Amino acid sequence: ALGLEEVSKHVGKEPSGRQFDDLTLLARSASSNGFSRVPFNPMVNAGAIMTAGLIDPDDSFTQRLRHIRQQFGRLIGWTADDSPSAEMPRFNKNMARQENFKGYNNIAMGYLLMATGSLPHTKTDLHRDIHPDEDEFDFYIEPAVTEALKLYFSICSLEMTATDVAMAAATLANSGVCPISQDRVLSQKTVRNCLPVLQSSGMYNASGTFFQQVGLPAKSGVGGGVLLIVPQLMGICIFSPRLDAQGNSVRGIEMSKRLTSKYLVHTFDGTMTDTDRLDPKLPIARWEANSCGEAIWAASNGNIRTLESLVSQQRDLQTGDYDIRTPLHLASAEGQFEVVKFLLDHGVK
């Protein structure tokens, strides 16, 4: 593994603000550690081509693709002992060929990356021109570009089901450990470094709006899929091919927004709690008990400040506990008359 520092020399971590297939590169200052012109991030085409070129560049294409398929397989629960629980992603060669025939923009990007010096060279020796006749000549083209593009097109042609993608997302949500195989596929540090890039750049030019509304790391694809990660809880794949102007699944985004409107999973939900949404990390009985118990404790102890806070959070102050004791009941029994007045003034019956 190259590690974050080495990879960061070749590819950035910044949102591009451009189309995913744009040929513009990120210009970095001379004092930065790495090359002066690199892809903005691994999510755009240029970054994906670059990262493909960084994977074991001295191995053969077959070895590199097998390694990548195995790693994807491990993300979704595949194990080397041929466990029936999951399979390695299928390589669709016909799709890869179509990418090659039509991917001229990506081919141009590959050579642009080579021109900047950021795409690693292969260690293949240059062939010598052995034709003495000046009308017969041959020349050698550095294969790093074609090899990186070939691998990139092949990765784009791997086939996975929605269940597979959801399991891969769950592995990322589980700090790099596959939930069904218990295989540590990625280190915790790698996952921590990956999720912020998904958050800032995973939804193309709608990444900022998506994170504001949904608040979760995500990655969309032009095939209509959305990979959604709820750290330490679950991974989700939403598949609906109809795309919006940014190239994201229309229903995938709507589903994600509805998820965070019902459950407390937004990254910044800790700063805004209300009773209209459930905390999926807590058992429902415990969640209801916590919500009710805090109000009852504050009422019985005369803690109006806590009750004011609960009102601002839109908590329900009329719910009773297992004995059907409500905050108003406890405040009256304990002689907390200021609390009784406060509750009545706020519509508690």
Segments from the language model and where they lie:
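Active-site-proximal alpha-helical segments within enzyme catalytic domains
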Residues: E159-C178, V230-P241
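Active-site-adjacent helix/loop patches that line small-molecule binding or acyl-intermediate pockets
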Residues: L2-I155, T163
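Ankyrin repeat domain, specifically the short helix-to-loop turn at the C-terminus of the second helix
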Residues: E308-D316, K341-V348
